[in-house]
From Swiss-Prot:
NCBIfam families: GGGWT_bact (NF040941). The lineage of its organism: Eukaryota, Metazoa, Chordata, Craniata, Vertebrata. It comes from Bos taurus (Bovine). Homotetramer; disulfide-linked. This is Angiopoietin-related protein 7. GO terms for cellular component: collagen-containing extracellular matrix; extracellular region; extracellular space.
Length: 344
């Protein structure tokens, strides 16, 4: 009996422990949403979706606006460049039309001048000292040749020899005092230098213009003993600057002995800053002048002026090998030209 009672108590204790550890209470059933609440939830989700779409559209519109602004700026810049190019082309066209008109005017003037020149006789125009001689200017001295717009020559001061061998000579070079250095550069020989009444070089540009028609060259020399000699050439031409003022000579005549200028025939002009000679050495620097150096000289009429006592000790003096050799520097030299058809 006691065993049954104890067994019942044990089972009761086990039940109580199990109940306390895992109580079982009655639960309420879940509350269902009303139709209004379901509708509100659906609207919120749609609103959020619309807000997202609006944000995306705003971003797209912003990007499109920026791109449109950039495209507009680019279009404006292109329009401005086109307008600038159009103005530039218009300016160029205007300048071209102006130059064309000016050229037509110049051609008209030149044609008129040419027509007037054809009707003139040689006595009407003054080209050089021979023209002055034909106009009865018979006194040797300084004259001014008027400018010639048709030939492009400016007014030119020259020294005319109206006495020697019939007169009419235009002097292009003189050495007599030694007061002017002839060791000059290309530009100075091109333009001319010195004193027209003393030592001078007329200028290669001027000499070129004066020798464009058939011209005779005369070279007169004097030594320190007072002896006089001359050399003449039936045909003298000086090329233009593009041709390096190349020298061309015809037949020689005179009493100076051997022709010492023919060695320089068909030779370009050289100066200390422009070496056009036919030698490895720079002859203009060796001979201290500007001249038609070949390789190097048989004459050096633009060399250093040495006075008596020093005149026979140097190779860079004013020399004419055919008379006194290579180391004798002359006392006086003149180079002069006149037309071949000149008649006193």
């Amino acid at each position: 009996m006691l065993k049954k009672t104890l067994s019942a108590v044990a089972w009761l204790c086990i039940f109580l422990v199990a109940f306390v550890s895992h109580p079982v209470w009655p639960q309420k059933p879940p509350k269902r949403k009303t139709p209004a609440e379901l509708t509100a939830a659906t609207c919120c989700e749609e609103a959020k979706a619309l807000q997202a779409q609006i944000a995306n559209l705003s971003s797209l519109l912003s990007d499109l606006g920026k791109k449109q602004e950039r495209d507009w700026v680019s279009v404006v810049m292109q329009v401005m460049e086109l307008e600038s190019s159009a103005k530039s082309m218009e300016t160029r066209l205007t300048e071209a039309e102006s130059k064309y008109s000016e050229m037509n005017n110049q051609i008209g003037i030149m044609q008129l001048q040419a027509a007037q020149t054809v009707t003139q006789t040689s006595a009407d125009a003054i080209y050089d000292c021979s023209s002055l001689y034909q106009k009865n200017y018979r006194i040797s001295g300084v004259y001014k040749l008027p400018p010639d717009d048709f030939l492009g020559s400016p007014e030119l001061e020259v020294f005319c020899d109206m006495e020697t061998s019939g007169g009419g000579w235009t002097i292009i070079q003189r050495r007599k005092s030694g007061l002017v250095s002839f060791y000059r550069d290309w530009k100075q020989y091109k333009q001319g230098f010195g004193s027209i009444r003393g030592d001078f070089w007329l200028g290669n540009d001027h000499i070129h213009r004066l020798s464009r028609r058939p011209t005779r060259l005369r070279v007169e020399m004097q030594d320190w003993e007072g002896n006089m000699r001359y050399a003449e050439y039936s045909h003298f031409v000086l090329g233009n600057e593009l041709n390096s003022y190349r020298l061309f000579l015809g037949n020689y005549s005179g009493d100076v002995g051997n022709d010492a200028l023919i060695y320089h025939n068909n030779t370009a002009f050289s100066t200390k800053d422009k070496d056009n000679d036919n030698c490895l050495d720079k002859c203009a620097q060796l001979r201290k002048g500007g001249y038609w150096y070949n390789c190097c000289t048989d004459s050096n009429l633009n060399g250093v002026y040495y006075r008596l006592g020093e005149h026979n000790k140097h190779l860079d003096g004013i020399t004419w090998y055919g008379w006194h050799g290579s180391s004798y520097s002359l006392k006086r030299v003149e180079m002069k030209i006149r037309p071949e058809d000149f008649q006193p």
